[in-house]
Amino acid sequence: MKRRLYLSSSSPRRKELLDQAGIPFDLVNAPVEETGLPNESPESFVLRMAVEKALSGFNKVPGKNVWVLGSDTIILKDGKVFGKPKHKMDAYRMLMSFSGEEHTVMTSIAIVNDGAVYSDVCQTNVFFRPISDSEFEQYWATGEAEDKAGAYGIQGQAAKFIEKIEGSYSAVMGLPLYELDKLLRESNFYSE
């Protein structure tokens, strides 16, 4: 029986990365409320979000021989969590706090298969060069900042702000492919 992977996400970047990795998948629409719990650590939050997304998707997919993937990304700097910007000034605040500084991107993944949950969190340090106000304005005008954690996408025009990374490029983009492959192997996705 052919195994199916379902992506419980609306992220075009996650779809692109799965295509890049050559992993066939279907989409399942299973949004979850992304709200932190009292005293929840950033790592616990991002991991819980991936698990909740995968479980929510699993509950919507018929059949037994299915694997459902959930993922979430947050940015952490100086103990503060940065999600998606709510408006232009929020994006400005985020990008200027990264300007000339280092921050951490945390991307979690979870796979649910037949009641079992496999999960991991990938942390990548990202170093920005200084960004001017005019560069921010130009970047904001591209529209790229609006739907991304930390108000930037490493794969887009914000790449020019990134001096270097320590960790996984694909995790910063939204789906750590090495960790995904590891979890797919652990969950016997590739087995005949």
Swiss-Prot record:
Keywords annotated in UniProt: Cytoplasm, Hydrolase, Nucleotide metabolism
E.C. code: 3.6.1.9
Annotated site, Important for substrate specificity, chain positions: 13, 73, 155
Pfam families: Maf
Chief place of localization: cytoplasm
Active site: 72 (proton acceptor)
GO molecular function: dTTP diphosphatase activity; UTP diphosphatase activity
Cofactor: a divalent metal cation
Intracellular or extracellular location(s): Cytoplasm
Gene Ontology cellular component list: cytoplasm
Catalytic activity: dTTP + H2O = dTMP + diphosphate + H(+); UTP + H2O = UMP + diphosphate + H(+)
GO terms, biological process: nucleotide metabolic process
SUPFAM superfamilies according to UniProt: ITPase-like
Membrane-traversing stretches: none
Function comment: Nucleoside triphosphate pyrophosphatase that hydrolyzes dTTP and UTP. May have a dual role in cell division arrest and in preventing the incorporation of modified nucleotides into cellular nucleic acids.
Similarity comment: family membership: Belongs to the Maf family. YhdE subfamily.
Protein name per the record: dTTP/UTP pyrophosphatase
